[in-house]
Amino acid sequence: MPEANKVYVFIDESGDPVYYGNRKKLLVDTDGFQPYLFIGMIETSDRKALRKAVVDFIESIREDSLYNSIPSTTTNKGWYVHARGDHPEIRAKFFELLRNLDGYKAHIVIAKKDLNIFNRKHNNNPTEFYFDVLHHLLNGRLLNVDCQYNLYLSQRGNNSLHRFQQAVDKALEANEIKTHGKIKYNLEIIASKEMPELSIIDYLMWAVQRKLLKGESRYFDALKDKYETVLNLYEEDIK
């Protein structure tokens, strides 16, 4: 059963907030440049069920002779479910799992990189850009003063607990005005391989990214009812 009055939030990203490389070389329109930053989250009150579903999936792959000879599952003892690196057959099976998995809702924010916005709003600072997008993701989401929110941010790049705290505090300022109460929360930054629940939002973001960058919508369409919001900050909604 879900834990009373506890909500778990798992946050991940795809792409990066970087515009410049070594010696301040502008990377826009060069090979390897990531044109978008995606940050997404899932909310659940039944963390144990989600975790069990992912862990059971990993164990079933390792025990199945049809899949356990795939190199990524045999050469990497720390293998975990990760959309970009997973074998297509494993990826398809995990999407099937997600189609039938309940007990969570997803939110995604898409930020197309715009150099003018980066210069004007984010002071040429990729960290400011990242946490501004994170603020948009969290804004208006954590509203129940009777809940204890537990937020887990996937450990990537220059993520820091201090900046995470700032982004959450900024998002909660407006929320607390609306709710006339103090929102209770805990924060933690953790590696994806140590938190199986993060694989769920990783796959949900991969589906959005695939639709946007490759024009392949079948993954997104298969999970469409799992997305509560998909916010495209600078362009039209993709839904």
Annotate each PLM feature.
Residues 1-239:
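Phosphate-ester processing/binding pockets and catalytic centers
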